[in-house]
């Protein structure tokens, strides 16, 4: 019961009931910061107090929480998914002048033309010298440079030109801190490329960070296994160098970091069993920001020479042009003969490694379901499948003891293979796969493995297969052309998606970037839950020209070997590249960026108001313009239904002016939870590496509302509004899809909005001229 009383109260404890949210604080906290509460508590006018002594204020109680926190501590923190503008209106009502000025400043600098990064700037990493703890600045950093960097989850590895390797970690309650400084084996090993992999526990914490480096010797690989102990704040590092008897152009961790695949561009593959290939360096190293490990390099190398290597060797029939992976148990390899192979352990063959042909460009055999064909049945294509480095009795083995008399013969075998591949490549006129990317998505309640290929003739090929089917091969779904076919090779591709379909992004060497949306047949409607045989549909939803965004800094592509930047077309990417571009995923539910999703599960799909489902990933493109602004373009929508009646904006959804005006050398994405995002992933960052040897981190959690929603697009469509009126006047409970004669029943009691969305989907499908055969889906 509410009643009016006199506000003169000597009690210092004040109880507030603001819109149903109850707060307890002191009188001084309120009257010293708020003109509203100063008048409320000190005036003689009557106030409304309930029977329990709470002052009742009819405002939004949830928005009052950060305001009260500021009045208590003097620090303002915007809660997750709370609008800054809404909080500002409440601050103005309560008359908290200091907070009002602070928020007004944040609103001003958060505009798309803000200065020096605005609210998106988080921190600047404090890089230090290894000789002392002096922080590196622009005046004394000429001697120490970052040569390579790689990030997985919240762990980052930096390799410097002085031979030191630094490991950095980001936590939920703290920004980047250095946990390890490690001197590599020797300065004679100039690292050319890094690749990394992580393992997580049930709490979604990164517990193991595996790092491999390809060196300038072309045949030497350095490997580090780093174990993190969060509870005792300790780190362990194990180190090993391995010599491969052929050049290494690609390498990748497999099977929970237990194996390392080393691949030559000439088709030689060596799979290294890492179980006995690591050498313990330190078992009890305390985590701190300037931890440095001393080691005896000579003793380590002597111990490494005494260990036996366990290698598996596979020889492909042609040159390798690129690699990609959709999960840690297999690796997709593209070759110059227009074929794509899958490297994996064969369960039926006692877990032996095998290589299977899964697709060939323009081969009609892959246009329909047939029985798979495995190269493991052809002894001419796979040799030395069981070769062990300790088996020196095999004269055909390309590995053996250094003192073996057949060592020259073994090297001759390698040279003969390479020479044949060179001749074959010069005479090859078939399309060359220049890049590829893969993912696992949930569609129609089933898992699908999707693969996209880019070729040197400017064509993008989209392939798919069901994960549950006991088949190795992929099947053709659609092809796309960026511009003039044959004149503009594809340099980068990305694929992701979910229940609403598949999103494909591609960029050519000339800077043309296009986005496509593909919907499978037998699509399940989000609004009714019914399966509708609509036929496959595809549409180009966006196109931008990155070459028009000239960059005076002449940025180059980062060739560090992570999941999204580790492809084979280095000459194409680095050739006259006047822009910088990366493709990444944006997690819609948890608002963070992540590297390529390798193990998406069905629980990655979430419900919106019980009606709509959407993919857990969106795509963005990041570009640096000539004014040193960071431009973010949308590569997909925010959430969608099945209709394709929308287009992506051609203008950036976000512009961040960078603080450092030197050219950006690389851009990396960081997520706390890991490269496989879950509901526990709570943050994401974008890191820019500058020529000044400085690293800046940027928060992008605010960009979610910049993505367009196709649901909103349909609601603003005149045809959609007409559909609502027609449905309200229609008492028939059945809609007939004349395109495929499938009857769709509405749910009883469905609202006009739901019915209109359903009708909009059917109209969109009826306007689609493509038939049910995905072979006919071409977009030029």
From Swiss-Prot:
PROSITE patterns: BTB. GO terms for biological process: protein homooligomerization. Residues 10-80 form the BTB domain. SUPFAM superfamilies: POZ domain. It holds the Pfam family BTB_2. InterPro entries: BACURD1-3, BTB/POZ_dom, SKP1/BTB/POZ_sf, T1-type_BTB. PANTHER family: BTB/POZ DOMAIN-CONTAINING ADAPTER FOR CUL3-MEDIATED RHOA DEGRADATION PROTEIN FAMILY MEMBER, RE57120P. This is Uncharacterized protein DDB_G0287347. It comes from Dictyostelium discoideum.
